[in-house]
From Swiss-Prot:
Phosphorylated by MAP kinases. This is Profilin-4. The gene is PRO4. GO terms for cellular component: cell cortex; cytoskeleton. It comes from Zea mays (Maize). Its main location: cytoplasm.
Amino acid sequence: MSWQAYVDEHLMCEIEGQHLSAAAIVGHDGSVWAQSESFPELKPEEVAGIIKDFDEPGTLAPTGLFVGGTKYMVIQGEPGVVIRGKKGTGGITIKKTGMSLIIGVYDEPMTPGQCNMVVERLGDYLIEQGF
């Protein structure tokens, strides 16, 4: 299965009538493996900040999490495993695997829990597969 198929079929899939607004699979070096059409362009410093927060949990909390120039308030995640952010009625979930970052962006009516489930389920599967 191609990386694009993982984005299209596993991240952008419909869940309880809803789906993510944007999603991507990105290497730890910031290279985009696959993304939805609506996913914003990631800046190198944004990826560096995300990786740093996984290595040193809490570093993004004071400044916020930036993805494609959009600022998200960092909310409770799983230190070193999952970063979650909130912006208005939407938000973001980022799951770190051994080689990649699985990123899902959502807006209402999708719920944070639905986003977390979609992103973390694929992340857990890729970890099991060695990615």
